[in-house]
Amino acid sequence: MDQNNSLPPYAQGLASPQSAMTPGIPIFSPMMPYGTGLTPQPAQSTNSLSILEEQQRQQQQAAAQQSTSQPTQAPSGQTPQLFHSQTLTTAPLPGTTPLYPSPMTPMTPITPATPASESSGIVPQLQNIVSTVNLGCKLDLKTIALRARNAEYNPKRFAAVIMRIREPRTTALIFSSGKMVCTGAKSEEQSRLAARKYARVVQKLGFPAKFLDFKIQNMVGSCDVKFPIRLEGLVLTHQQFSSYEPELFPGLIYRMIKPRIVLLIFVSGKVVLTGAKVRGEIYEAFENIYPILKGFRKTT
């Protein structure tokens, strides 16, 4: 027993664990899981963390109840602000321009440089009216040419009788099929009157002529805008509607879409309008082109 109690000095520390244990270092046990004693432990326990989280949650709930029970008075132009809601402002900030104009704000209309509603005060004059009529019977053109006055017929040059009258001053083309074309009248009434006179001449020559399907096929008008026009600038700006070849023809050809009218525009300011079926199309086309011509007026 004395030999067991007497241990060498180097083994005395191992025999007494309490004297060999360093403060702050845990005691290792063979049954302890590997790495348990090596993991540093936090200085604060989990009980203290849960207490702090519970206090923060209680403070947030108290603040939410206070904000919902006492809503703040919203200023003018703003909606009441609730907890975790975004403020919606309808009034613009000072010194900024609102994105959408107010419906009560008066809006200034944009005036075009050459308004289409501007009246020119110029009325185009009708220069020629082309009309057609059907006499309703076959005609012997040689007989008409020999027996009628002021009639000529040359079948090698043109297969129709050319007849003229003085009042109204017009010319008729009479075909063997009974169709007739009347040109040269200055108004719709004159064109109809002239066509009836030609039909009466044919009747007197012994043909059963009638007066069927009278129709105006074309009207030609002209006017003067009283100022020179820059045709080069006009054709560049309106090149999809116009063509200008001064070496071939001195006028600019402008093909209007609505109404379907063709205009011949000259540098002197003279304008010729053709292709109309009624008189109103001539007037409408000129009122449409006049602001454009005014925009290309020569200054010198």
From Swiss-Prot:
Residues annotated as transmembrane: none
Cited CDD domains: TBP_eukaryotes
Subcellular locations according to the entry: Nucleus
GO molecular function: DNA binding; RNA polymerase III general transcription initiation factor activity
Chain positions of Sequence repeats: 126-202, 216-293
Keyword Cell inner membrane: no
Gene Ontology, cellular component aspect: nucleus; transcription factor TFIID complex
GO-annotated biological processes: DNA-templated transcription initiation; transcription by RNA polymerase II; transcription by RNA polymerase III
Bias type Low complexity, positions: 57-99, 107-117
Region Disordered, annotated ranges: 1-22, 53-119
Keywords: DNA-binding, Nucleus, Repeat, Transcription
Superkingdom field: Eukaryota
Family listed: Belongs to the TBP family.
Known partners and oligomeric status: Belongs to the TFIID complex together with the TBP-associated factors (TAFs). Binds DNA as monomer.
Cited function: General transcription factor that functions at the core of the DNA-binding multiprotein factor TFIID. Binding of TFIID to the TATA box is the initial transcriptional step of the pre-initiation complex (PIC), playing a role in the activation of eukaryotic genes transcribed by RNA polymerase II.
HAMAP family: TATA_bind_prot_arch
UniProt protein name: TATA-box-binding protein
Provenance organism: Protobothrops flavoviridis (Habu)
Gene of this entry: TBP
